[in-house]
Structures are given as structure tokens and as C-alpha cells.
Amino acid sequence: MELTRYEIIKILMEYVTDEIVVCNIGIPSKELFKINDREKNFYMLGSMGLSSSIGHGLALSVNEKVIAIDGDGSVLMNMGSLATIGKTTPKDFLLLIVDNCAYGSTGNQETHSTCTDLYQVSKACGIDSIGVFNEEQLRDAVKLALSESGTKVIVAKARPHNENVPNINLVPTEIKHRFMNAIKK
């Protein structure tokens, strides 16, 4: 059975230790904040489609593992990011694409990932990719991706669902300064 985005993020965060995490805009960021708020989490509050690009840029400029959590709708909005990631292949970057075939933060309208296989697209861009469809596959893929160097993409199929979580109680400048201080330590 497919997991929800909240369940996928929760499982990912069970394995995160000191990695940098950049999370997609809207409800996914609120869900991550509820699951495991940490200084090395960057919560996107705007700029749909840029979580993968911000994570990619960080992965090229820091000497630690960077994880970007993105949704299918955001990746579809910025598909060029996959080609750029595939061309530059940072040494420690994981892009987790939660593919629920929906724009979750705006009411679960259907995305074009119903007819566009993001796993195949990321593979075609030259990225070491895996598609997962259940909890066991997700856990195995996350453990593998975090234990190896290189660039990896996990496309986790999910069922559309927005967890009822509170808003992030940090203002954008707080998020930025807290994050910047954490990654320069």
C-alpha cells in the first residue's frame, strides 16, 4: 500500500542524523517541521519547484550530505533541475521526490505525473535513481542512499493526503539565519 507524504517524510527522518535537509514549499515543509524540526532543515515558504535546485546548489558547495525533498508537481515545474543535477552529479546529494500525482498544498489537483514517469526521467538524465512503492522499499532505498556517496534520486509513489499539522512558527528570516548558522558550523 502506498504511503502518504507525511509517512514518507517521517520514515526518511528516522535515518537522518546530521545531513542538511531542504524541503518543498507549503504543507510538506509544515509536515517536516512537525515531524522533526532541526536547525539543518530549510523550510521552503515560496518558490515552487526550487527545492531540488537549492539542495543541488548546497550539495555542490558543502562537504556533507544534502537531502532535498520535493513533490512531483514541483519537479514537473522545474524539470530542467533533473538535467542539471544529472550533468553535475554532486558527491553527496539525495533528491527524494514524493510522487502523489497531486498538487497537495493547493487541494490535491492531479499533476501530469499520472502520465510522466519521474523515475524514468531522472534515469534518462543520468542520475542513479530508484522507484519505491511501499515502506520496505523506501527504507531500503533511504538506507542505501545515505550510506553511499554520489547523487541519488528516490521517487516514492504516494497517495494524496495532507496531514493536519500546525503552521511553522518561525518567520522566514529566522529560518534563513538559523539554517545558515547551522551549516557553517
UniProtKB/Swiss-Prot annotation:
Keywords: Coenzyme M biosynthesis, Decarboxylase, Lyase, Thiamine pyrophosphate
Catalytic reactions on record: 3-sulfopyruvate + H(+) = sulfoacetaldehyde + CO2
CDD domains for the chain: TPP_ComE (cd03372)
Cofactor requirements of the protein: thiamine diphosphate
Comment on bound cofactor: Binds 1 thiamine pyrophosphate per subunit.
Pathway: Cofactor biosynthesis; coenzyme M biosynthesis; sulfoacetaldehyde from phosphoenolpyruvate and sulfite: step 4/4
Any one Gene Ontology molecular-function term assigned to this protein's record: sulfopyruvate decarboxylase activity
EC number: 4.1.1.79
Listed Pfam families: TPP_enzyme_C
Gene Ontology BP terms: coenzyme M biosynthetic process
Subunit structure as annotated in this protein's UniProt entry: Heterododecamer composed of 6 subunits alpha and 6 subunits beta.
Function: Involved in the biosynthesis of the coenzyme M (2-mercaptoethanesulfonic acid). Catalyzes the decarboxylation of sulfopyruvate to sulfoacetaldehyde.
Name recorded for this polypeptide: Sulfopyruvate decarboxylase subunit beta
Organism whose genome encodes this protein: Methanococcus maripaludis (strain DSM 14266 / JCM 13030 / NBRC 101832 / S2 / LL)
